[in-house]
């Protein structure tokens, strides 16, 4: 194949997801460099070209073929009704490693208690199509207006209710808003253009990227532990290790000793290491994990 064809164009989300996305890619082994005010990140991989673009537009441009692959939310795929290949679920967001929610929210003092109370009301949101479908499913007639941002400030003067995205609900609470219902749970997805997915070289490149990105997500909050232990203490040590699988055990030159290696939750380490030491382990050391491939 001609080398000029061996380029994968990737769309990276600009805005709230940008920093967490670039960090995820770095952990997966893809180190993008973004210059101030530039929308074209560089990377030491001649087979990749990247552009920063808003997640809201990503699925549309991937469908058109402007990008071979991109990252955006399930919400924006639904909102734009984009015809793309959903390659992988990547459960991370701007502030956590969990999905976000699109919720129906009203002022704390509002009489609105359920979606049925929205009959004849006015709703502001960025996800107009998702909101209209939600109202239709519930048999409610209400007007839905596109919001360009700062949606939380619109009730009660500019809207009776809003449909807004949240991770923790803290922004809604700060603006004295109450959640009435969760409309949609969304997470980031790696998506591909259909023609690109049918290209064998591009598909392999995309699948490899998906594997490494998922591995980076799997490794979040995990660390590795290595240690030596006398065989006489092995049973007691193995019993207190909350490993993902059974610990890896290797023989040492001294036939009475073995080496153990495990992957554990980082949250357990401060309790676990003293217990391992008391159980007879020696030479314990902890190391970070960038990727964990199942």
UniProtKB/Swiss-Prot annotation:
The protein's name in its UniProt record: ATP phosphoribosyltransferase
HAMAP family, alphabetized: HisG_Long
Tagged with keyword Lipid biosynthesis: no
Gene name of the encoded protein: hisG
EC number annotated for this UniProt entry: 2.4.2.17
Cofactor(s) listed: Mg(2+)
GO cellular component: cytoplasm
Localization annotation: Cytoplasm
Domain of life: Bacteria
Top-rank EC class of the record's enzyme: transferase
Cited function: Catalyzes the condensation of ATP and 5-phosphoribose 1-diphosphate to form N'-(5'-phosphoribosyl)-ATP (PR-ATP). Has a crucial role in the pathway because the rate of histidine biosynthesis seems to be controlled primarily by regulation of HisG enzymatic activity.
Pathway the protein contributes to: Amino-acid biosynthesis; L-histidine biosynthesis; L-histidine from 5-phospho-alpha-D-ribose 1-diphosphate: step 1/9
Primary localization class, coarse: cytoplasm
Reaction catalysis annotation: 1-(5-phospho-beta-D-ribosyl)-ATP + diphosphate = 5-phospho-alpha-D-ribose 1-diphosphate + ATP
A GO term for molecular function: ATP phosphoribosyltransferase activity
UniProt keyword Phosphoprotein, yes or no: no
Regulation of catalytic or functional activity: Feedback inhibited by histidine.
PANTHER family membership: ATP PHOSPHORIBOSYLTRANSFERASE, ATP PHOSPHORIBOSYLTRANSFERASE ATP-PRTASE
Entry keywords, A to Z: Amino-acid biosynthesis, ATP-binding, Cytoplasm, Glycosyltransferase, Histidine biosynthesis, Magnesium, Metal-binding, Nucleotide-binding, Transferase
Family: Belongs to the ATP phosphoribosyltransferase family. Long subfamily.
């Amino acid at each position: 194949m001609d080398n000029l064809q061996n380029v994968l164009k990737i769309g990276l989300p600009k805005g709230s997801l940008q920093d967490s996305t670039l960090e995820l890619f770095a952990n997966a082994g893809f180190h993008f460099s973004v210059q101030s005010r530039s929308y074209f990140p560089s990377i030491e991989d001649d087979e990749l070209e990247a552009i920063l673009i808003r997640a809201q537009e990503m699925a549309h441009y991937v469908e058109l073929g402007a990008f071979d692959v991109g990252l955006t939310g399930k919400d924006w795929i639904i909102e734009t009704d984009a015809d793309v290949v959903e390659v992988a679920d990547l459960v991370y967001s701007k502030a956590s490693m969990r999905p976000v929610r699109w919720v129906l929210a009203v002022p704390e003092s509002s009489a609105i208690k359920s979606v049925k109370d929205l009959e004849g009301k006015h709703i502001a949101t960025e996800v107009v199509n998702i909101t209209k479908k939600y109202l239709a499913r519930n048999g409610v007639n209400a007007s839905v207006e596109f919001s360009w941002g700062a949606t939380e400030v619109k009730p009660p003067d500019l809207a009776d209710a809003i449909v807004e995205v949240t991770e923790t609900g803290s922004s809604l609470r700060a603006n004295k808003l109450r959640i009435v219902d969760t409309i949609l749970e969304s997470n980031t997805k790696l998506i591909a253009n259909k023609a690109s997915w049918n290209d064998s070289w591009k598909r392999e490149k995309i699948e490899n990227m998906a594997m490494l990105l998922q591995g980076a997500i799997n490794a979040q909050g995990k660390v590795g532990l290595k240690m030596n232990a006398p065989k006489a203490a092995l049973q007691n040590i193995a019993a207190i290790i909350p490993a993902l699988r059974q610990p890896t055990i290797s023989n040492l030159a001294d036939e009475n000793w073995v080496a153990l290696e495990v992957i554990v939750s980082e949250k357990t380490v401060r309790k676990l290491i003293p217990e391992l030491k008391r159980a007879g382990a020696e030479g314990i050391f902890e190391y970070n994990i960038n990727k964990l491939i199942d």
